[in-house]
Amino acid sequence: MTIFQGRATRKPSGGKLRPNHSKRRYELGREPTLTRLGDRELRKIRSYGGNSKFALLRCDYANVYNPKDKTTRKVKINTVKENSADPHYVQRNIMNRGTVISTELGDARITSRPGQDGVINAVLL
């Protein structure tokens, strides 16, 4: 089943909206990329205009920025500690933007979008 991100067919009052045009390709969405903990695995996605995005399917390293000494290091991710998007993501070790992860340096919050950027960037808490 495809994901449609166009205009709804009903008004807030419940009345029916007449479509101006049929569904277009640029109104399509896609299934969410649930980035999990594991060996690095990427998927290339063709986006609008022939450009490409890289969906990160699995990853076990993150680029962690330390605001105190202003350095960035590539460190191993131990586990997912907190995820405000869905509490069940913690049990399944699914990472997205805003997730708190446990690393070798300590706890960090993910600032990148792994499902679209293809990399995990985080800031130490």
From Swiss-Prot:
Residues 1-30 are annotated as: Disordered. Keywords: Ribonucleoprotein, Ribosomal protein. One of its GO terms (cellular component) is ribonucleoprotein complex. Disulfide bonds: none annotated. GO terms for biological process: translation. GO terms for molecular function: structural constituent of ribosome. It comes from the Archaea. Part of the 30S ribosomal subunit. Belongs to the eukaryotic ribosomal protein eS8 family. This is Small ribosomal subunit protein eS8. The gene is rps8e.
